[in-house]
Amino acid sequence: MAPNAADKCPVMNNAAEKCPVMHSNGVSSIQSHGPRDIYTLEALSHFNREKIPERAVHAKGTGAYGEFEVTADISDICNVDMLLGVGKKTQCVTRFSTTGLERGSSDGVRDLKGMAVKFFTEQGDWDWVSLNFPFFFIRDPAKFPDMIHSQRRDPQTNLLNPSMTWDFVTKNPEALHMTLLQHSDFGTMFTWRTLSSYAGHAFKWVMPDGSFKYVHFFLASDRGPNFTDGSTAKIDPNDPDFATKDLFEAIERGDYPTWTANVQVIDPKDAPKLGFNILDITKHWNLGTYPKGLDTIPSRPFGKLTLNRNVKDYFTEVEKLAFSPSNLVPGVEPSEDPILQARMFAYPDAQRYRLGIDHLKAPIRRKETSCKHDLGPEFDQWLSQVTSESWSHPHEDDYKFAREYYEVLPEFRSQEFQDRMVENLYKSVAQGPEDLRKRVYETFELVSTELARRVREGAEVIVADMAQPDSPERAQPGQQRL
């Protein structure tokens, strides 16, 4: 019997256009009329284009799938379909990230951490784009590029240079509150599974009659805080992906991380009585810790997020993920927070650059829905009628919130907690030139005389030691991350 012709043929692979290719692991020689190896040329051109630009911010990250379950009835304040009905479940995908540095940088850098969740609701995608702190460095979106650049690599040396950050902070005192928190143990990275995240911005939850409440929602890790007495002993300094590996391996073995969803609520008529602008993202809504003298705005738990499945293709399922705070569903509207308004433009615009104009057709985004995505009408009456704000200029509250955070730490956490924050501050400040250090001390004087003294004394001791030729403290500027 004649052998089957197919048995003599090499294994065939499909090219990009679904055409069979006989020898995908070898190149055809040049024929008398020129090269004809279309597959090799196609493979090379695809290789040259297979990567996409990294994110402008939050470039380093990882992700996983999960589900959200409603655990409490909040129908008295909320008309979002996904949140109506105890026990109702919604599938989602989550991405964790650092903020300022590039892909390949360490999970453990002392900067903001992101936790973005895309809920695949019956009415379309709803994105929670959150950070591990409930407030931010700036309230004026025009300052955002400078703020991010100040936390990146020095454009001359390509090294990390804390002086760039301190130059920004001393010129923009609204960043002091965030800077103190970032240098405390709250800014110490441990694992993604212990990261709590906060939407930060005020949103509106709108009822069917058109009334609304201002809300802050956040996800509190059920595993506790993202630090252990300031210790990072379990973190391998030689493994920049320690948190990424920890999350993946935990889900693989069935140790699913969970978060409790909480919401704080403010009635618009109560906003003028609170003593600060609730739309200023450099301030937080007091949960009962600080500032003293301001009303506590309690939180209500209403749901549980569980991550229970790892991705199979990181590039397609995580790198091509696109989040935006503008991805809302009926019953949710943005507030008038200027940073939020700017982000609602900047995120989709960044995605059009990074992923192309057809990024909404990516498989991770293909969610069928029979509901229109346009929101209800915007309301003419809003908070600006009762609260005026100059978003660019310093206010006394910029120093007050930072001052009260510093002063409450021994009671709220411990004296050692406060001491470690001060140590992190002066180690960072010490790397700057004398004129910048002086400006930092003067800025801290406006927060707390004691804080300024402690930072000055600690930094100048390090500077004096570094001046010694044989000092082990000597280092090139920019070698230590903030």
UniProtKB/Swiss-Prot annotation:
It is an enzyme of class 1 (oxidoreductase). The keyword DNA-binding does not apply. The active site is at 58. GO terms for biological process: hydrogen peroxide catabolic process; indole alkaloid biosynthetic process; response to hydrogen peroxide. Its EC number is 1.11.-.-. Keywords: Alkaloid metabolism, Heme, Hydrogen peroxide, Iron, Metal-binding, Oxidoreductase, Peroxidase. It comes from Arthroderma otae (strain ATCC MYA-4605 / CBS 113480). GO terms for molecular function: catalase activity; heme binding; metal ion binding. This is Catalase easC. Heme binds at residue 347. Signal peptide: none annotated. GO terms for cellular component: mitochondrion; peroxisome.
